[in-house]
Design a protein with these regions (language model features):
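Short, flexible coil/linker segments at domain boundaries that flank nucleotide/cofactor-interacting
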Residues: 4-8, 87
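Conserved acidic carboxylate
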Residues: 15
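Two-component/phosphorelay signaling modules centered on CheY-like receiver
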Residues: 18-37, 42-43
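Acidic, metal-coordinating helix/loop segments flanking the phosphotransfer/catalytic sites
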Residues: 38-66
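C-terminal output helix
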Residues: 44, 120-131
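Alpha4 helix (beta4-alpha4-beta5 surface) of REC/receiver domains from two-component response regulators
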Residues: 69-73, 77, 90, 99-117
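Hydrophobic/aromatic residues positioned on beta-strands within the core alpha/beta folds
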Residues: 95-96
Length: 138
């Protein structure tokens, strides 16, 4: 994908750390001007997924503030719900600070996500490249 690959793309960022969410948004917008939507609200997230208008979801594995039907929900479970609600193939990139051996593989296997990004992310180019590579597959 070229430098304009994110132009006109809609990316939903689900991240409960405001600083990390801002970093993700700025990095992706600078990489081509795509529209980044921030949300931690599960009904809003599922509405966006069902709309068919998203091009990618960047989803934190360890959500601490998200609830669904009166109970806490994590990013792995939310990923499955997003995939189920989307009317078309919707790439999901999980973001996680869990770096123990096998964590990423387990998250990918149990969530149905398309990729995993290890946090903290110090280089925005790594984030942008992961997003672009998943959009190439869509």
């Amino acid at each position: 994908m070229n430098e304009l690959a994110l132009r006109g793309k809609r990316i939903l960022i689900v991240e409960d750390n405001a600083l990390v969410a801002k970093f993700f948004r700025m990095a992706l917008e600078r990489a081509g001007g795509g529209e980044c939507i921030l949300s931690e609200d599960v009904p809003t997230i599922l509405h966006h997924a069902a709309s068919g208008e998203l091009d990618l979801v960047l989803l934190d594995v360890s959500l601490t503030n998200s609830e669904w039907e009166g109970r806490a929900i994590n990013g792995v479970e939310l990923c499955r719900m997003v995939k189920e609600k989307s009317p078309r193939r919707l790439p999901v990139l999980l973001a996680t600070a869990h770096a123990m051996s096998g964590d990423r593989e387990r998250f990918l296997e149990t969530s149905g996500a398309d990729g995993c990004l290890e946090k903290p992310v110090y280089d925005s180019a790594i984030l942008v490249e992961k997003v672009r590579s998943l959009m190439d597959l869509a």
